[in-house]
């Protein structure tokens, strides 16, 4: 279904089995009290006497934060008929029962949704400075606390967005040319006050700590105690501790793989901005249980001949001057870790081109590694995208790993407990840094992705074709024939690796939008139905029921959630009780 065709109205991170799809929207005005120089919180929860009720598709009440925060509303269950595709009609009802709040982290001043909550009063939360934008958010799956990574700050908030703790990460005097960084040894370069952009925010549940990585000092990380954001350790004395000095958010992604009773592993992918000698583009690192361990963030394996990392060769950067790999999303499923990336194409006939970024063609790819593979022999990378009516969507914007629910699973030929990957792509393969508004919501099954990777491995081990990883190998390398059985858990050998491919892994296109580029996606399951929530370039939220092939998806409605039209960012998360939603945006 297309965004242009829908007459159902125009239209958030975690797939959850919701108790009900929320439909009734309660709005409330209430007083607030100043508890901090930058934080306003409500004195009381809304009662029932002052709650006018409006019907809406919006499945979650909303609360926002990003330079500021707004608190809002809650919704009652929708009827089964509404889940079958009927449009929900707005009308005023009598006040409903006492309700809580739903939240969205949004980047605007005292945000008001004109169509739903005109005249309402909202609480607000904002950083010390307007330019210190929010970058990442995550919700603790046991306590429900929110952790927000921002420019120069890490915040811990309660579920209703009350500020609990703030940890300073910048600004500090620095210079990107200082290597090793200033905190290790003096630097002769001129130093200037430099902001610290949060690029990675991960909860290490097994050790009750938060990993926060920024752009300062060549990309140093901190391990913070979850309770009070106290610094447990800030590793910085080895070159392995510098992840990347790129100060752009959305270019790095990490996945923590815990190990019961043992040290965990951090898989991390990052853009390197031409500093391939300093930073690997992808690596796996140690996460010792002891924060003071000298092995903290060391590579899992590092010898002269084999290592748990891959670097972009200098020859590639010499031939394709703007080459880099941007890591959009990552996750673990089964025995594997996956990353979704966007990178310039480097076919054989273009490796001698050093054109501008506007001349480059970009490819979105899925990268798979075995969780226990310290040698990276299991590295496989295949292109991914969607096609609708002959139009290719190849520029990845966002992704989310979720569950399909009974209805979508049946249409995809999988179990309701299988993993599915929701993705948003923009049209074409050019202008990655300024993607087209024409975009598509698609779904892949992890089972299909693994099957395509298995086929690629089997073909190569039969001696067919080449490794097809020109950006890394610099040339076409013939696959080596070897009588090796390739099963579903195959993790590679010291031949035929690392392995690429050129055959597109195509997802199922669910929904397209030609004018308001989709920028984020999440999902939840109710009564067997899968519902996707999609943020857009203009600060809107879409609700889409996902039926899968051949019907695609049905958009119910769209609501404007950001007054100044700032894009909704990738990070979205449900609250612990699954009745709340947090959506983030920054002032562009």
Predicted regions located by residue number:
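Intrinsically disordered, low-complexity basic segments at termini and long loops, enriched
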Residues: 1-83
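Residue-level signal for tight coil/turn positions that link beta-strands
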Residues: 55, 141-143, 151, 205-207, ...
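N-terminal signal peptide
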Residues: 57, 72, 84-86, 96-128
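Beta-strand-rich domains and repeat architectures in extracellular enzymes and scaffolds
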Residues: 122-153, 195-200, 248-253, 324-329, ...
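Surface-exposed extracellular loop regions of Gram-negative outer-membrane beta-barrel proteins
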Residues: 322-340
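Beta-propeller fold recognition
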Residues: 164-188, 199, 203-208, 214-322, ...
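Double-stranded DNA-binding cores of transcription factors and transposases
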Residues: 137, 157-169
């Amino acid at each position: 279904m297309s965004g242009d065709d829908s007459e159902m109205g125009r239209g958030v991170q975690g797939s959850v089995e919701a108790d009900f799809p929320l439909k009734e929207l309660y709005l409330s005005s209430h007083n607030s009290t100043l508890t901090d120089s930058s934080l306003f919180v409500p004195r009381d929860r809304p009662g029932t006497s002052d709650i006018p009720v409006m019907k809406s598709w919006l499945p979650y009440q909303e609360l926002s934060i990003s330079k500021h925060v707004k608190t809002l509303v809650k919704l009652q269950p929708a009827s089964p008929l509404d889940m079958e595709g009927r449009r929900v009609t707005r009308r005023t009802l009598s006040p409903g029962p006492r309700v809580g709040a739903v939240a969205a982290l949004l980047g605007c001043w005292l945000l008001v949704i004109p169509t739903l909550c005109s005249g309402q009063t909202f609480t607000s939360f904002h950083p010390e400075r307007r330019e210190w934008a929010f970058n990442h958010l995550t919700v603790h799956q046991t306590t429900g606390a929110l952790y927000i990574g921002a420019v120069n700050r890490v915040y811990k908030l309660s579920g209703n967005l009350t500020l609990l703790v703030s940890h300073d990460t910048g600004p500090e005097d620095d210079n990107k040319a200082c290597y090793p960084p200033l905190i290790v040894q003096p630097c002769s370069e001129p130093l200037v006050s430099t902001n610290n952009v949060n690029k990675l925010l991960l909860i290490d549940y097994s050790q009750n700590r938060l990993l926060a990585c920024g752009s300062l000092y060549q990309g140093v990380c901190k391990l913070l105690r979850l309770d009070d954001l106290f610094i447990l350790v800030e590793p910085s004395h080895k070159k392995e501790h510098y992840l990347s000095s790129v100060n752009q958010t959305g270019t790095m992604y990490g996945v923590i793989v815990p190990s019961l009773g043992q040290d965990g592993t951090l898989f991390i992918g990052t853009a390197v901005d031409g500093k391939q000698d300093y930073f690997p583009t992808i690596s796996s690192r140690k996460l010792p249980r002891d924060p003071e361990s000298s092995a903290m963030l060391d590579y899992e394996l590092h010898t002269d001949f084999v290592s748990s990392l891959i670097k972009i060769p200098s020859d590639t950067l010499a031939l394709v001057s703007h080459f880099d790999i941007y890591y959009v999303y990552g996750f673990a499923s089964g025995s594997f870790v996956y990353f979704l990336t966007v990178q310039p194409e480097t076919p054989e006939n273009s490796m001698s081109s050093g054109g501008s970024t506007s001349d480059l063609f970009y490819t979105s790819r899925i990268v798979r590694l075995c969780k226990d593979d310290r040698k990276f022999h299991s590295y496989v990378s295949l292109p991914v995208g969607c096609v609708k009516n002959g139009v290719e969507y190849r520029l990845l914007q966002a992704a989310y790993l979720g569950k399909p629910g009974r209805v979508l699973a049946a249409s995809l030929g999988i179990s309701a407990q299988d993993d599915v990957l929701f993705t948003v792509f923009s049209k074409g393969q050019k202008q990655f840094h300024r993607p087209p508004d024409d975009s598509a919501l698609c779904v892949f099954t992890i089972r299909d992705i693994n099957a395509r990777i298995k086929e690629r491995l089997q073909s190569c081990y039969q001696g067919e074709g080449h490794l097809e990883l020109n950006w890394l190998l610099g040339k076409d390398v013939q696959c080596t024939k070897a009588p090796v059985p390739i099963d579903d858990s195959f993790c590679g050998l010291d031949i035929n690796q690392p392995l690429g491919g050129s055959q597109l892994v195509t997802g199922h296109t669910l929904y397209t939008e030609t004018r308001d580029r989709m920028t984020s996606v999440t999902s939840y399951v109710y009564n067997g139905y899968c519902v996707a929530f999609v943020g857009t370039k203009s600060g809107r939220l879409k609700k889409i029921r996902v039926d899968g092939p051949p019907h695609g998806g049905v958009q119910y409605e769209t609501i404007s959630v950001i007054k100044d039209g700032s894009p909704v960012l990738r990070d979205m998360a449900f609250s612990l009780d699954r009745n709340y939603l947090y959506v983030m945006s920054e002032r562009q």
